[in-house]
Amino acid sequence: MMICHQCLDQDDSSEEEEAVSVYSPSTLVKLARQRLLREEALVISALKGLPNMLFPVIFEEAFINGHTKILKAMIPMWPFPYLSVGALTNNCNLKTLKAVLDGLDILLAQKVRSSRCKLRVLKWRDEQHDFCGIWPGSHEAEDLPELMTQKHPVQNNPDCGVKKELRVTTELSVMKGRLDDSATYLLEWAQQRKDSIHLLCRKLVIETLTKDTVIEIFKIVNADCIQELELYSLCLEDLAFLNPYLRQMDNLLELTLDHVTDSLSMGDSEMCEEEMITLVSQLPTFPCLQKLCVNDVYFIYGNLNEILRCLKKPLVSFCISNCELSQSDLDCLPYCLNIFELKCLYLIDIPLNHLCLDPLGFLLESVRHTLECLELKSCDMGEPQFNALLPALSQCSHLTDVSFWENELSLLFLKQLLQHTSKLTQLSYELYPAPLECYDDRGLILSHRLEQFCPELLDILRAKRQPKDIAFVTNPCSKCGRYYVYDPKTQRFSLEDTTL
């Protein structure tokens, strides 16, 4: 039997049924999509006999194009244990969400379920996974059983271990104090079906806290199932309010604190130092925390030891940016054993020119066998500060990424720095500041000098190893914000305005 491509596109269901036996899967996928767009009722009626391999592509097409009846009908027949909608939810509307949840309601209401349906976990909003998660076997290890695949599982975790008919995992974002309509509807839906549905929030983002919204979230969501928490634009009083919930987050892996001020939520008054110290000391211990990112948080100054006290397991990634540190903050580093296995250390926009960095050098020596990424950017570091780090830096043999941009180093000292980094054979990304000789007395960038000095600097590295991705960059222009970048491949400089 032969069928031409023109006949294949004709609206003849009998011919299409015959084509199933002779055409490749890719052709069948195309045919299924065409039929989907033309006859919604036919697709729904054919679901019982539809091959498993066609379910994902038809579901995707229905989701993107808003075929809510098809979505509702497919859920009770889903032939895989997992359905990860992933990035598709970014552009979906409330009507689409309701259709998916209506499908789950049909499934829950069935006294005798179809032998074909194997759905156990619906991943609704998950930025880390795309739509490929609907294919069988793609993410099965993540939820079998709950929390057992974590590196540091918590032994006593009854809430997350509850066995219910279905699990729905999602990410929630409270923006400007409120949830969006879809998240609100999902929470209300889950609350009404709490006996049969287990709603898990893996990632919670809060930007500007509204207490009523947070209370409603934790009436439904188990805090000990949250693995990523991002807090933006809060005051210390807000952290005090969140503290009871933070104490329940025994499985938290990543924590971001961004722009936390000392102003009270009511009025412009500020907390006294004693109140601040009390609140900071009450921050809970996180048994599983692996990544900590702190940006523009005023209470870090003089209290870094209290922050690091919250760690129970060794930290993997530590980032501090747009903060001020005291000498006592640095002095505590050699005694914080929970940062001695760091893979990534980022200190960004922190003035260090007035501090003794010997303790930081000790930390680098302690993590020399684990550290892979080191960023000391825009820290106003000069030669005395770098001198304290160079002996330990040259021992960090596992480093793959380094950035020392926006620090003040002379040409002579930059050569000395490169003599040390030339020994680091695993480096694949390097960002160095242009030497001070590339500026005149007024701070004007002398781009021709950058082009003159950089080949000489590169030769220092090439004598020991072949650099991969490397650049020498001037400080940003105070007027336009752009900077000159020397590219070794073209042996020319260029004016850039993109983020490095």
Swiss-Prot record:
Keyword Repeat appears in the UniProt entry: yes
Protein name in the entry: Oogenesin-3
Keyword Phosphoprotein (UniProt): no
Swiss-Prot/TrEMBL GO biological process terms: negative regulation of apoptotic process; negative regulation of cell differentiation; negative regulation of DNA-templated transcription; positive regulation of cell population proliferation
LRR repeats: 116-143, 198-222, 223-248, 249-285, 286-311, 312-343, 344-367, 368-395, 396-420
Cited SUPFAM superfamilies: RNI-like
Lineage: Eukaryota, Metazoa, Chordata, Craniata, Vertebrata
Tissues/organs with expression: Expressed in ovary, specifically in oocytes. Detected in follicles with two layers of granulosa cells, and are present in early as well as large antral follicles.
Record PANTHER family: OOG4 PROTEIN-RELATED, SIMILAR TO PREFERENTIALLY EXPRESSED ANTIGEN IN MELANOMA-LIKE 3
Organism for this UniProt entry: Mus musculus (Mouse)
Similarity comment text for this entry: Belongs to the PRAME family.
Keywords: Leucine-rich repeat, Repeat
Positions of transmembrane segments: none
